[in-house]
Protein backbone atom coordinates (compact mmCIF):
# COMPACT_ATOMS: atom_id res chain seq x y z
CA UNK A 1 0.00 0.00 0.00
CA UNK A 2 2.86 2.37 0.78
CA UNK A 3 4.33 1.85 -2.72
CA UNK A 4 0.98 2.47 -4.39
CA UNK A 5 0.38 5.62 -2.32
CA UNK A 6 3.83 6.97 -3.24
CA UNK A 7 3.17 6.34 -6.93
CA UNK A 8 -0.18 8.13 -6.78
CA UNK A 9 1.40 11.08 -4.95
CA UNK A 10 4.20 11.39 -7.51
CA UNK A 11 1.69 11.15 -10.36
CA UNK A 12 -0.38 13.92 -8.76
CA UNK A 13 2.67 16.16 -8.45
CA UNK A 14 3.63 15.47 -12.08
CA UNK A 15 0.17 16.32 -13.37
CA UNK A 16 0.09 19.47 -11.25
CA UNK A 17 3.40 20.61 -12.72
CA UNK A 18 1.97 20.19 -16.20
CA UNK A 19 -1.20 22.14 -15.40
CA UNK A 20 -2.02 25.18 -17.48
CA UNK A 21 0.01 28.09 -16.13
CA UNK A 22 -2.22 30.91 -17.42
CA UNK A 23 -5.96 31.61 -17.34
CA UNK A 24 -7.93 32.73 -20.41
CA UNK A 25 -11.30 34.52 -20.54
CA UNK A 26 -12.61 34.90 -24.09
CA UNK A 27 -15.54 36.67 -25.74
CA UNK A 28 -16.22 37.07 -29.45
CA UNK A 29 -15.18 35.23 -32.61
CA UNK A 30 -12.45 32.62 -32.09
CA UNK A 31 -11.39 32.87 -35.75
CA UNK A 32 -8.37 35.13 -36.09
CA UNK A 33 -8.74 38.17 -38.34
CA UNK A 34 -5.97 40.29 -39.79
CA UNK A 35 -7.04 43.91 -40.31
CA UNK A 36 -4.45 46.67 -40.40
CA UNK A 37 -4.48 48.43 -37.02
CA UNK A 38 -3.38 52.00 -36.39
CA UNK A 39 -0.40 52.86 -34.26
CA UNK A 40 -1.07 54.47 -30.90
CA UNK A 41 -0.70 54.39 -27.15
CA UNK A 42 -3.31 55.04 -24.47
CA UNK A 43 -2.15 55.91 -20.94
CA UNK A 44 -4.67 55.98 -18.07
CA UNK A 45 -3.94 57.21 -14.57
CA UNK A 46 -5.98 54.63 -12.68
CA UNK A 47 -9.40 54.16 -11.06
CA UNK A 48 -12.36 53.83 -13.49
CA UNK A 49 -11.47 53.89 -17.17
CA UNK A 50 -12.35 56.91 -19.30
CA UNK A 51 -14.85 55.66 -21.90
CA UNK A 52 -13.90 58.17 -24.59
CA UNK A 53 -10.22 57.27 -24.36
CA UNK A 54 -11.05 53.57 -24.39
CA UNK A 55 -13.09 54.06 -27.57
CA UNK A 56 -10.05 55.80 -29.09
CA UNK A 57 -7.95 52.76 -28.14
CA UNK A 58 -10.43 50.19 -29.48
CA UNK A 59 -10.98 52.04 -32.75
CA UNK A 60 -7.24 51.75 -33.43
CA UNK A 61 -7.69 47.96 -33.54
CA UNK A 62 -9.77 48.42 -36.73
CA UNK A 63 -12.14 45.56 -36.00
CA UNK A 64 -9.39 43.21 -34.89
CA UNK A 65 -8.62 41.20 -31.78
CA UNK A 66 -7.95 42.78 -28.38
CA UNK A 67 -5.97 41.04 -25.65
CA UNK A 68 -5.94 42.20 -22.03
CA UNK A 69 -3.01 41.04 -19.92
CA UNK A 70 -2.79 40.99 -16.15
CA UNK A 71 -1.20 39.07 -13.28
CA UNK A 72 -4.28 38.85 -11.04
CA UNK A 73 -8.01 39.35 -11.54
CA UNK A 74 -10.36 37.96 -14.16
CA UNK A 75 -12.56 39.07 -17.06
CA UNK A 76 -13.72 42.51 -15.94
CA UNK A 77 -12.71 44.11 -19.24
CA UNK A 78 -14.28 41.60 -21.64
CA UNK A 79 -17.90 42.75 -21.83
CA UNK A 80 -16.91 46.38 -21.32
CA UNK A 81 -14.64 46.41 -24.37
CA UNK A 82 -16.61 43.99 -26.54
CA UNK A 83 -20.18 45.21 -26.15
CA UNK A 84 -20.56 48.27 -23.92
CA UNK A 85 -18.71 50.98 -25.86
CA UNK A 86 -20.21 50.54 -29.33
CA UNK A 87 -16.90 49.84 -31.07
CA UNK A 88 -16.83 46.90 -33.50
CA UNK A 89 -14.04 44.46 -32.63
CA UNK A 90 -13.62 40.77 -33.42
CA UNK A 91 -12.85 39.52 -29.91
CA UNK A 92 -11.56 40.35 -26.45
CA UNK A 93 -9.45 37.88 -24.54
CA UNK A 94 -8.12 38.42 -21.03
CA UNK A 95 -4.98 36.46 -20.23
CA UNK A 96 -3.98 36.17 -16.57
CA UNK A 97 -0.22 35.62 -16.72
CA UNK A 98 1.11 35.15 -13.16
CA UNK A 99 4.56 33.64 -13.79
CA UNK A 100 7.47 33.41 -16.19
CA UNK A 101 6.22 29.96 -17.21
CA UNK A 102 2.84 31.44 -18.12
CA UNK A 103 4.51 34.28 -20.01
CA UNK A 104 6.42 31.78 -22.14
CA UNK A 105 3.44 29.49 -22.79
CA UNK A 106 2.96 28.87 -26.54
CA UNK A 107 -0.74 29.76 -26.35
CA UNK A 108 -0.02 33.10 -24.67
CA UNK A 109 2.63 33.85 -27.27
CA UNK A 110 0.28 32.98 -30.15
CA UNK A 111 -2.63 35.04 -28.88
CA UNK A 112 -0.49 38.10 -28.26
CA UNK A 113 1.09 37.83 -31.71
CA UNK A 114 -2.38 37.64 -33.29
CA UNK A 115 -3.67 40.72 -31.45
CA UNK A 116 -4.18 44.12 -33.04
CA UNK A 117 -4.46 45.80 -29.63
CA UNK A 118 -3.12 44.92 -26.18
CA UNK A 119 -4.28 46.47 -22.90
CA UNK A 120 -2.22 46.13 -19.71
CA UNK A 121 -4.52 46.13 -16.69
CA UNK A 122 -3.76 47.73 -13.35
CA UNK A 123 -1.99 45.86 -10.61
CA UNK A 124 1.59 45.80 -9.34
CA UNK A 125 4.16 46.82 -11.94
CA UNK A 126 6.86 44.90 -10.09
CA UNK A 127 5.00 41.71 -11.03
CA UNK A 128 4.91 42.77 -14.67
CA UNK A 129 8.66 43.25 -14.72
CA UNK A 130 9.42 40.11 -12.70
CA UNK A 131 7.09 37.84 -14.68
CA UNK A 132 6.98 39.31 -18.20
CA UNK A 133 10.32 40.98 -18.90
CA UNK A 134 12.63 38.97 -21.19
CA UNK A 135 9.84 36.51 -22.01
CA UNK A 136 7.51 35.86 -24.93
CA UNK A 137 5.20 38.56 -23.54
CA UNK A 138 7.49 41.54 -23.98
CA UNK A 139 8.76 40.13 -27.27
CA UNK A 140 5.18 39.94 -28.58
CA UNK A 141 4.34 43.41 -27.27
CA UNK A 142 7.34 44.91 -29.03
CA UNK A 143 6.39 43.13 -32.25
CA UNK A 144 2.87 44.57 -31.93
CA UNK A 145 4.31 48.06 -31.53
CA UNK A 146 7.10 47.98 -34.10
CA UNK A 147 6.16 45.34 -36.69
CA UNK A 148 2.38 45.18 -36.78
CA UNK A 149 2.13 48.89 -35.85
CA UNK A 150 -0.75 48.15 -33.50
CA UNK A 151 -2.06 49.96 -30.45
CA UNK A 152 -1.05 49.40 -26.84
CA UNK A 153 -2.42 50.87 -23.64
CA UNK A 154 -2.67 50.45 -19.93
CA UNK A 155 -3.98 51.86 -16.69
CA UNK A 156 -2.26 52.44 -13.35
CA UNK A 157 0.60 49.91 -13.25
CA UNK A 158 -0.17 49.21 -16.91
CA UNK A 159 0.64 52.87 -17.65
CA UNK A 160 3.64 52.92 -15.32
CA UNK A 161 5.64 50.43 -17.41
CA UNK A 162 5.08 52.07 -20.81
CA UNK A 163 8.04 54.49 -20.87
CA UNK A 164 11.60 53.95 -22.02
CA UNK A 165 12.34 54.43 -18.32
CA UNK A 166 9.87 53.32 -15.68
CA UNK A 167 9.41 53.20 -11.93
CA UNK A 168 9.40 49.46 -11.29
CA UNK A 169 8.48 49.46 -7.56
CA UNK A 170 10.55 46.29 -7.18
CA UNK A 171 11.06 46.97 -3.49
CA UNK A 172 8.51 49.12 -1.65
CA UNK A 173 6.40 52.00 -2.94
CA UNK A 174 8.19 55.29 -2.40
CA UNK A 175 6.92 58.69 -1.24
CA UNK A 176 7.90 62.15 -2.39
CA UNK A 177 9.58 62.88 0.94
CA UNK A 178 11.79 59.79 0.71
CA UNK A 179 12.65 60.39 -2.95
CA UNK A 180 13.53 64.05 -2.49
CA UNK A 181 15.59 63.32 0.64
CA UNK A 182 17.63 60.75 -1.30
CA UNK A 183 16.89 60.12 -4.99
CA UNK A 184 18.98 56.93 -4.71
CA UNK A 185 16.83 55.55 -1.90
CA UNK A 186 16.61 51.77 -2.30
CA UNK A 187 12.90 52.08 -3.04
CA UNK A 188 13.51 54.41 -6.02
CA UNK A 189 13.89 51.54 -8.48
CA UNK A 190 14.10 52.81 -12.05
CA UNK A 191 14.20 50.46 -15.03
CA UNK A 192 15.56 51.69 -18.34
CA UNK A 193 15.40 50.54 -21.94
CA UNK A 194 14.74 46.90 -21.13
CA UNK A 195 10.99 46.27 -21.36
CA UNK A 196 8.84 48.02 -24.00
CA UNK A 197 10.51 49.48 -27.08
CA UNK A 198 8.01 52.11 -28.21
CA UNK A 199 9.30 54.98 -30.38
CA UNK A 200 6.50 57.19 -29.05
CA UNK A 201 7.86 56.75 -25.52
CA UNK A 202 11.59 57.33 -26.10
CA UNK A 203 12.95 59.61 -23.42
CA UNK A 204 9.70 59.32 -21.42
CA UNK A 205 8.90 58.17 -17.89
CA UNK A 206 5.36 58.11 -16.46
CA UNK A 207 3.53 58.31 -13.16
CA UNK A 208 -0.08 57.57 -12.24
CA UNK A 209 -2.78 58.32 -9.63
CA UNK A 210 -1.40 61.84 -9.76
CA UNK A 211 -4.22 63.63 -7.96
CA UNK A 212 -2.49 62.44 -4.83
CA UNK A 213 -0.40 65.64 -4.27
CA UNK A 214 2.46 63.59 -2.84
CA UNK A 215 3.40 62.31 -6.28
CA UNK A 216 4.73 65.57 -7.75
CA UNK A 217 7.90 65.51 -5.70
CA UNK A 218 8.69 61.87 -6.30
CA UNK A 219 8.09 62.28 -10.03
CA UNK A 220 10.65 65.09 -10.18
CA UNK A 221 13.00 62.71 -8.39
CA UNK A 222 12.37 60.00 -10.97
CA UNK A 223 13.08 62.39 -13.84
CA UNK A 224 16.19 63.71 -12.09
CA UNK A 225 17.51 60.17 -11.81
CA UNK A 226 16.89 59.55 -15.50
CA UNK A 227 18.67 62.74 -16.56
CA UNK A 228 21.61 62.08 -14.24
CA UNK A 229 21.99 58.34 -14.79
CA UNK A 230 21.46 58.21 -18.55
CA UNK A 231 22.82 61.66 -19.49
CA UNK A 232 19.97 62.48 -21.84
CA UNK A 233 16.84 64.58 -21.94
CA UNK A 234 13.83 62.98 -20.26
CA UNK A 235 10.21 64.13 -20.16
CA UNK A 236 7.51 62.94 -17.76
CA UNK A 237 3.85 62.18 -18.48
CA UNK A 238 1.58 61.90 -15.44
CA UNK A 239 -2.18 61.36 -15.22
CA UNK A 240 -4.73 61.92 -12.50
CA UNK A 241 -7.14 59.10 -11.85
CA UNK A 242 -10.06 58.94 -14.33
CA UNK A 243 -7.79 60.72 -16.85
CA UNK A 244 -6.10 59.45 -20.02
CA UNK A 245 -3.48 60.55 -22.53
CA UNK A 246 -3.79 59.14 -26.07
CA UNK A 247 -0.93 59.55 -28.56
CA UNK A 248 -1.40 58.64 -32.21
CA UNK A 249 0.88 58.81 -35.22
CA UNK A 250 0.71 62.62 -35.22
CA UNK A 251 2.35 62.63 -31.75
CA UNK A 252 -0.30 64.93 -30.31
CA UNK A 253 -1.00 63.78 -26.75
CA UNK A 254 -4.77 64.19 -26.41
CA UNK A 255 -6.09 64.37 -22.85
CA UNK A 256 -9.42 62.74 -21.98
CA UNK A 257 -11.34 63.21 -18.75
CA UNK A 258 -14.43 64.71 -17.17
CA UNK A 259 -13.59 68.43 -17.12
CA UNK A 260 -15.38 70.77 -16.43
CA UNK A 261 -17.52 68.54 -14.21
CA UNK A 262 -14.42 66.96 -12.67
CA UNK A 263 -10.90 68.27 -12.14
CA UNK A 264 -9.11 65.69 -14.31
CA UNK A 265 -5.57 66.61 -15.36
CA UNK A 266 -2.55 65.31 -17.21
CA UNK A 267 0.91 66.76 -16.67
CA UNK A 268 3.70 66.99 -19.22
CA UNK A 269 6.85 67.52 -17.18
CA UNK A 270 9.62 69.00 -19.31
CA UNK A 271 13.04 69.98 -17.97
CA UNK A 272 13.86 73.51 -19.09
CA UNK A 273 16.85 72.28 -21.09
CA UNK A 274 14.49 70.30 -23.36
CA UNK A 275 12.79 73.56 -24.30
CA UNK A 276 15.70 75.99 -24.42
CA UNK A 277 18.51 73.67 -25.46
CA UNK A 278 21.63 72.60 -23.66
CA UNK A 279 21.83 70.16 -20.79
CA UNK A 280 21.04 71.36 -17.28
CA UNK A 281 21.05 68.34 -14.99
CA UNK A 282 20.18 68.56 -11.31
CA UNK A 283 22.70 70.55 -9.29
CA UNK A 284 22.74 67.79 -6.65
CA UNK A 285 21.59 64.26 -7.41
CA UNK A 286 23.82 62.04 -5.30
CA UNK A 287 23.18 58.97 -3.21
CA UNK A 288 22.46 59.87 0.39
CA UNK A 289 21.92 63.59 -0.22
CA UNK A 290 18.75 65.67 -0.76
CA UNK A 291 17.92 66.51 -4.34
CA UNK A 292 18.50 70.02 -5.66
CA UNK A 293 17.21 70.84 -9.13
CA UNK A 294 16.59 74.55 -9.21
CA UNK A 295 18.29 76.58 -11.96
CA UNK A 296 16.86 79.90 -10.76
CA UNK A 297 13.47 78.34 -9.92
CA UNK A 298 13.06 77.32 -13.57
CA UNK A 299 14.47 73.80 -13.66
CA UNK A 300 11.31 72.12 -14.92
CA UNK A 301 8.45 73.40 -17.04
CA UNK A 302 5.13 71.65 -16.56
CA UNK A 303 2.19 71.85 -18.96
CA UNK A 304 -0.96 70.96 -17.01
CA UNK A 305 -3.88 70.01 -19.26
CA UNK A 306 -7.53 69.48 -18.35
CA UNK A 307 -8.98 66.24 -19.69
CA UNK A 308 -12.25 66.63 -21.60
CA UNK A 309 -14.72 64.09 -23.03
CA UNK A 310 -13.71 64.92 -26.62
CA UNK A 311 -9.95 65.02 -26.02
CA UNK A 312 -9.63 68.44 -27.65
CA UNK A 313 -6.90 69.64 -25.27
CA UNK A 314 -3.48 68.31 -26.11
CA UNK A 315 0.29 68.63 -25.85
CA UNK A 316 2.60 68.39 -28.86
CA UNK A 317 5.07 65.58 -28.21
CA UNK A 318 6.93 66.44 -31.41
CA UNK A 319 8.35 69.68 -30.02
CA UNK A 320 7.48 69.31 -26.32
CA UNK A 321 7.02 73.08 -26.30
CA UNK A 322 3.41 73.81 -27.24
CA UNK A 323 -0.10 72.66 -26.46
CA UNK A 324 -3.77 73.56 -26.47
CA UNK A 325 -5.98 74.01 -23.41
CA UNK A 326 -3.26 73.88 -20.75
CA UNK A 327 -1.27 76.17 -18.47
CA UNK A 328 2.47 76.29 -17.85
CA UNK A 329 4.02 76.08 -14.38
CA UNK A 330 7.54 75.87 -12.98
CA UNK A 331 8.58 73.06 -10.66
CA UNK A 332 11.89 73.09 -8.78
CA UNK A 333 13.58 71.51 -5.78
CA UNK A 334 15.96 73.02 -3.22
CA UNK A 335 17.67 70.69 -0.75
CA UNK A 336 14.83 68.19 -0.94
CA UNK A 337 12.04 70.78 -0.80
CA UNK A 338 9.63 70.78 -3.75
CA UNK A 339 8.09 74.06 -4.96
CA UNK A 340 5.94 75.16 -7.88
CA UNK A 341 5.06 78.51 -9.37
CA UNK A 342 3.16 80.03 -12.26
CA UNK A 343 4.85 81.20 -15.44
CA UNK A 344 3.77 84.70 -16.55
CA UNK A 345 1.88 84.66 -19.84
Regions found by a protein language model. Give the residues of each.
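Short, solvent-exposed loop/turn and secondary-structure capping segments
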Residues: 79-80, 130-131, 164-166
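Catalytic nucleophile loop
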Residues: 119-122, 145-166
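Catalytic-core regions built around general acid/base machinery
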Residues: 111-114, 134-149
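N-terminal beta1-alpha1 cap of cysteine-dependent amidohydrolase-like domains
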Residues: 21-121
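Bacterial Sec-dependent N-terminal signal peptides
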Residues: 1-21
Amino acid sequence: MKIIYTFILLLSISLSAQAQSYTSYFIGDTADVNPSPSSGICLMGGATEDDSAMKWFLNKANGGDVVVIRVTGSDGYNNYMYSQLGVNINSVETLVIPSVAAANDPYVRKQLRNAEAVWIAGGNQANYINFWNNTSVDTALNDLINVKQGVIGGTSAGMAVQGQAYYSALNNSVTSAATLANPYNSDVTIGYNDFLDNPKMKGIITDTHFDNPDRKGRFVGFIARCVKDYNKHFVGIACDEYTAVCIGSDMLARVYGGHPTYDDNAYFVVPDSCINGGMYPPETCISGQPLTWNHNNQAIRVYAVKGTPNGSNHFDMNTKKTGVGGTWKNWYVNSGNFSEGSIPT
